[in-house]
């Protein structure tokens, strides 16, 4: 009996079969234990003691801290500030399925769930012990034993006469096989936030690194380039957008210093020098939202137009567009992009301060749009003010803007004004600040849309309202029913977020 016990051992670990050929008798020995596994909630593993062929165990794979490190880079890379790709070599043991090469294509369509998916790793390789065989790499977090296969998968295996027995394989990993987040999490100090996301502007990755990440900035930049096809330059913003022209000073972390770029947004093409103008790819949805509010024939005044993400789509929609930007570079690229998108005949472009634009070209056009001769006008007038840090201050330009002018229109202009807020109730905060500047409550006139979360406790919002006649036509008696138009359809208010 003792000699028999020496040939067996019990373990709580899951059985894994090495990459070796297994005798048929060995497989038969294991089958009676299948029901016992379920009852005991443990796996009695039998070791067949044979000099040529043997069973061995593989650590049970669970979702715990140790297992989550299976595909983590070696611990030696912690604290690395200059990227050394050779330091990321590592060998891990993963489950594999042995199959005949002629069934691989049919089988892989049914094993998408179970197959390993890692950057740069082939899911099927040649069996080193059998030139006619293949090894299918399996996901070690999903595939433990034969029972890990789903019913449909087992059915396919049976149809193709494939033994569902799982073997193990030593897989060599290199830098190319790790994801950017895994690399940075392994390099940066434990417990620190990891930067794996960025704003993509053509070939440029725009990062906004925090203080604790700065010692690793060049490594982070290179990783972003390595792991994102098409990215050839990584830059970091090194000051806030608070200057006159809304662009920011940036540092090239890695890659080429060429900041001339081309982007596609909502089927339109924009070209510009990213180091000299403002562009935020995270506003793509907002650009589209405003465009959808416009109808052919409407008039759009874009007070802070940038390189044209509001103006050009509006012109393509057959709106009359007046676009302005104070930055000479933005003005230059706005003209260029209008030609590039073939709307240069539909957009009037200005290079003025926002307030001068409102009190000059906008006022002159409104006098025509809202004058007595425009009684039959059916289209709407929209004014977009996308300068979140300061746009609300420019609302004062509407006060008495048309004072002394005849009030002959029914549809007053609709303003879309953007702002940031750190208030606990950001929508109410924006409404109150806008009302303070205008000197009139906007509660009955406005709706507030949450554009995006900029940072913890900081929101970007858009307040939309039809300018009250009492603001535009100061000290004049007006018929509110005729001049203020229908109430705006409410979008998202402070109650919605």
Swiss-Prot record:
The name this protein goes by in its record: tRNA (guanine(37)-N(1))-methyltransferase
Residue spans of biased composition, Basic and acidic residues class: 480-497
GO biological process annotation, one example: tRNA N1-guanine methylation
SUPFAM superfamilies reported for this sequence: S-adenosyl-L-methionine-dependent methyltransferases
UniProt entry tagged with the keyword Repressor: no
EC number: 2.1.1.228
Cell compartment(s), UniProt: Mitochondrion matrix; Nucleus; Cytoplasm
DNA-binding is among the record's keywords: no
Entry function: Involved in mitochondrial tRNA methylation. Specifically methylates the N1 position of guanosine-37 in various tRNAs. Methylation is not dependent on the nature of the nucleoside 5' of the target nucleoside. This is the first step in the biosynthesis of wybutosine (yW), a modified base adjacent to the anticodon of tRNAs and required for accurate decoding.
InterPro entries given in the database record: MeTrfase_TRM5/TYW2 (IPR030382), SAM-dependent_MTases_sf (IPR029063), TRM5-TYW2-like_MTfase (IPR056743), TRM5/TYW2-like_N (IPR056744), tRNA_Gua_MeTrfase_euk (IPR025792)
UniProt keyword list: Cytoplasm, Methyltransferase, Mitochondrion, Nucleus, S-adenosyl-L-methionine, Transferase, tRNA processing
Main subcellular location of this protein, as a coarse class: mitochondrion
Reactions catalysed, as given in the entry: guanosine(37) in tRNA + S-adenosyl-L-methionine = N(1)-methylguanosine(37) in tRNA + S-adenosyl-L-homocysteine + H(+)
Originating gene: TRMT5
Chain positions covered by the region annotation Disordered: 478-497
Molecular functions per Gene Ontology: tRNA (guanine(37)-N1)-methyltransferase activity; tRNA methyltransferase activity
Gene Ontology CC terms, in alphabetical order: cytoplasm; mitochondrial matrix; nucleus
Family: Belongs to the class I-like SAM-binding methyltransferase superfamily. TRM5/TYW2 family.
Quaternary structure and interacting proteins, as annotated: Monomer.
UniProt-listed Pfam families: TRM5-TYW2_MTfase, TYW2_N_2
Binding site for S-adenosyl-L-methionine: 287, 325-326, 353-354, 386
């Amino acid at each position: 009996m003792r000699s028999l016990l020496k040939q067996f051992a019990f373990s709580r670990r899951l059985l894994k079969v090495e990459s070796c050929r297994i005798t048929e008798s060995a497989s038969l020995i294991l089958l009676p234990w299948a029901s016992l596994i379920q009852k005991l909630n443990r796996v009695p593993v039998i070791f067949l003691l044979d000099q040529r062929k043997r069973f061995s165990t593989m650590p049970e794979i669970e979702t715990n801290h140790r297992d989550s490190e299976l595909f983590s880079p070696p611990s030696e890379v912690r604290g690395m500030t200059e990227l050394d790709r050779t330091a990321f070599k590592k060998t891990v043991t993963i489950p594999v399925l042995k199959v005949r090469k002629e069934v691989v294509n049919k089988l892989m369509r049914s094993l998408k769930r179970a197959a390993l998916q890692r950057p740069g790793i082939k899911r099927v390789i040649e069996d080193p012990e059998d030139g006619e065989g293949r090894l299918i790499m399996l996901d070690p977090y999903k595939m433990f034993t034969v029972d890990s296969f789903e019913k449909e998968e087992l059915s396919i295996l049976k149809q193709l006469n494939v033994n569902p027995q799982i073997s193990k394989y030593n897989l060599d990993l290199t830098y190319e096989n790790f994801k950017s987040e895994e690399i940075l999490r392994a390099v940066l100090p434990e417990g620190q936030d990891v930067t794996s996301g960025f704003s993509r502007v053509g070939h440029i990755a725009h990062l906004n690194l925090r203080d604790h990440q700065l010692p690793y900035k060049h490594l982070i930049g290179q990783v972003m380039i390595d792991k994102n096809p098409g990215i050839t330059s990584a830059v970091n913003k090194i000051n806030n957008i608070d200057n006159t022209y809304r662009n920011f000073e940036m540092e090239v972390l890695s890659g080429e210093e060429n900041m001339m770029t081309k982007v596609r947004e909502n089927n339109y093409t924009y070209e510009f020098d990213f180091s000299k103008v403002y562009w935020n790819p995270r506003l793509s949805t907002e650009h589209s939202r405003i465009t959808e509010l416009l109808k052919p024939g409407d008039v759009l005044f874009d007070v802070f137009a940038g390189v044209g993400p509001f103006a050009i789509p509006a012109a393509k929609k057959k709106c009359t567009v007046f676009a302005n930007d104070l930055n000479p570079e933005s003005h230059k690229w706005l003209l260029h992009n209008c030609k590039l998108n073939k709307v240069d005949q539909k957009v009037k472009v200005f290079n003025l301060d926002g307030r001068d634009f409102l009190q000059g070209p906008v006022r002159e056009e409104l006098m025509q749009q809202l004058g007595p001769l425009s009684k039959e006008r059916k289209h709407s007038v929209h004014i977009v003010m996308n300068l979140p840090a300061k746009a609300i201050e420019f609302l004062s330009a509407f006060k008495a803007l048309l004072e002394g002018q005849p009030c002959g229109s029914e549809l007053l202009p609709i303003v879309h004004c953007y702002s940031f807020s750190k208030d606990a109730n950001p929508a109410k905060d924006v409404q109150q600040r806008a009302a303070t500047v205008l000197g009139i409550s906007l509660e009955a006139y406005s709706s507030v849309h949450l554009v995006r979360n900029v940072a913890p406790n900081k929101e970007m919002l858009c307040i939309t309202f039809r300018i009250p006649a009492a603001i535009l036509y100061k000290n004049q008696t007006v018929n509110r029913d005729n001049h203020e138009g229908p109430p705006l359809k409410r979008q998202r208010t402070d109650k919605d977020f």
